[in-house]
């Protein structure tokens, strides 16, 4: 096994084709990390010109100290049963990490627990310290240890039927409601950032500046690994649909009124049907007024939600999502999610990753809503083997490990105070 010098394109091709590859190991992802002070180095090992393993090493300075942390996010990308390749990757990583004055090498492989026996054993044998099997969104991890993934390698009907029943009904309703899902361009990031600000204010979290999303889009869109989707509501088109539904409801009432006059047996049923239709008419009249007001103010329509969809080979990722407070009954997010899944499938993806979660948290948990949303999309829990540290400077590592919990608690307190404002 030997060190190899490969191009960025060769690195990315290996990551995208390897079952343990991940978005965070793509070379263009490292470009997105520069804004937050990270810089990258890359390594590869192989035999007879054939690549056996790669890794993208991210480095960040420790504040006020001449040291760095080496972080291999969702790496190494290698067959973890191949001890020789794994050992060669570690040797290469140590060489670079020491040159960059790293106090530790941290990895969190994209390897699931039920397939991770070799990885766990071989990493520990090499001297890696396992950080344990904590909850998916534990503050002790950089990346979530658990994510929710929908298999999308199936036709439209099979995909829809894989969703939980109530969610399936909502998707079907969303498709009828009259929103349009657009695959947007860079200009659409302005709208997305505005929606993200609204979402943050509603849900109580700090949001990123537009430059953050532009950075991701600029780095990954050219290779087809980042797409922006926006959901639009056209008032004129939907007023026409509401008028059609109102006409149908009035016709329905006339039909049941006629039955009431001709059949005493059906009188009770007819009255119930009439009452139901009248309730629907009242709701549609309210909706029509709202749409007419919208048409006066925004005749071109408004955007209700948006998302960034990412790719790494056969894996797709719902990275960021945002939505308006208006016209939520149109279920724009349901229309968008189903559309993005189909788009991802059509562009070679077999899985759709909703991102981090805990495993079936209690209803009073701050993470319950996140889990409840993600579980209804035909997802399974992807539980990773977690983080591992290879210590290069034991005294500094111990010091930072002792200080880190206090910093985490301080960040949580600040975050909670901001939420209450």
UniProtKB/Swiss-Prot annotation:
Belongs to the FemABX family. SUPFAM superfamilies: Acyl-CoA N-acyltransferases (Nat). It catalyses: beta-D-GlcNAc-(1->4)-Mur2Ac(oyl-L-Ala-D-isoglutaminyl-L-Lys-D-Ala-D-Ala)-di-trans,octa-cis-undecaprenyl diphosphate + glycyl-tRNA(Gly) = beta-D-GlcNAc-(1->4)-Mur2Ac(oyl-L-Ala-D-isoglutaminyl-L-Lys-(N(6)-Gly)-D-Ala-D-Ala)-di-trans,octa-cis-undecaprenyl diphosphate + tRNA(Gly) + H(+). It is found in: Cytoplasm. GO terms for cellular component: cytoplasm. It holds the Pfam family FemAB. Catalyzes the incorporation of the first glycine of the pentaglycine interpeptide bridge, which is characteristic of the S.aureus peptidoglycan. This glycine is added to the epsilon-amino group of the L-lysine of the membrane-bound lipid II intermediate (GlcNAc-(beta-1,4)-N-acetylmuramic acid(-L-Ala-D-iGln-L-Lys-D-Ala-D-Ala)-pyrophosphoryl-undecaprenol), using glycyl-tRNA(Gly) as donor, in a ribosome-independent mechanism. Involved in methicillin resistance. It comes from the Bacteria. Monomer. Its EC number is 2.3.2.16. Signal peptide: none annotated. Keywords: Acyltransferase, Antibiotic resistance, Cell shape, Cell wall biogenesis/degradation, Cytoplasm, Peptidoglycan synthesis, Transferase. This is Lipid II:glycine glycyltransferase. Its main location: cytoplasm. InterPro entries: Acyl_CoA_acyltransferase, FEMABX, PG_Glycine_Bridge_Synth. It comes from Staphylococcus aureus (strain MRSA252). GO terms for biological process: cell wall organization; peptidoglycan biosynthetic process; regulation of cell shape; response to antibiotic. One of its GO terms (molecular function) is aminoacyltransferase activity.
